[in-house]
Amino acid sequence: MTTAEPRLALATRGLTKTYGDGESLVRAVDAVDLEVARGETVAVMGPSGCGKSTLLHLVGGLDRPSSGEIDLAGRRIDRLGERALARLRRTDVGFVFQAFHLMDELTVVENVELPALLAGHSPRRARARAMALLDRVGVEHKAGSLPTALSGGQRQRVAVARALSNEPVLVLADEPTGNLDSAATLDVLRLFEELHESGQTLVIVTHDERIAATADRLITMRDGAFVDETRLTGGTSGRLGALAGFES
């Protein structure tokens, strides 16, 4: 008998991150409760400094909470030691950042296969997975190129492929189109829509309402807390309608 997978990809309870103390205490994330179902796309919006990027860093294991709980696929991760947390980042979480964070001295395929190699996969398996992902995101013809030879949209596609290298439970995207023009933004959002349709769980931090409109659920943050939550009921047709806004 097999054990059923947890319904939730991510859950937080009372998640808090503070900086400073006394009168200088800042609550970057303030007692946040969040649940993200498997296969769901959640967008988080809010003004600069509201805590949305800090929230992403906490749930992805890039930073430690001051208090509260984080469960990833039913596993409590806020209590993990540094070594276990580093392993989790390599295997269960994929990151897509605004600034790409590709290694310019490595080829495109070497960038994509790196997380799998670090997680202990064989070079042959890591390379095969990387090439399949590059084909999936439409830049397999750039496998041997350096990132500096790619356009912004192509580099972000490579970053998405790298984030998927270890088939993560959760992909976290922090302003993934912030450095892209409208055409490249449309390409990346179409890719996210394909990921959504394949059942990938996504949490996207963005300032762009059109990008947020492609999600299943929109959460608004202010001063470290959730102040509004809206379920977007348009389904696939609604998301594709939002994408059409980039074409006009």
Describe each PLM feature range.
Residues M1-T18, R231-S248:
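ABC-family P-loop ATPase nucleotide-binding domain
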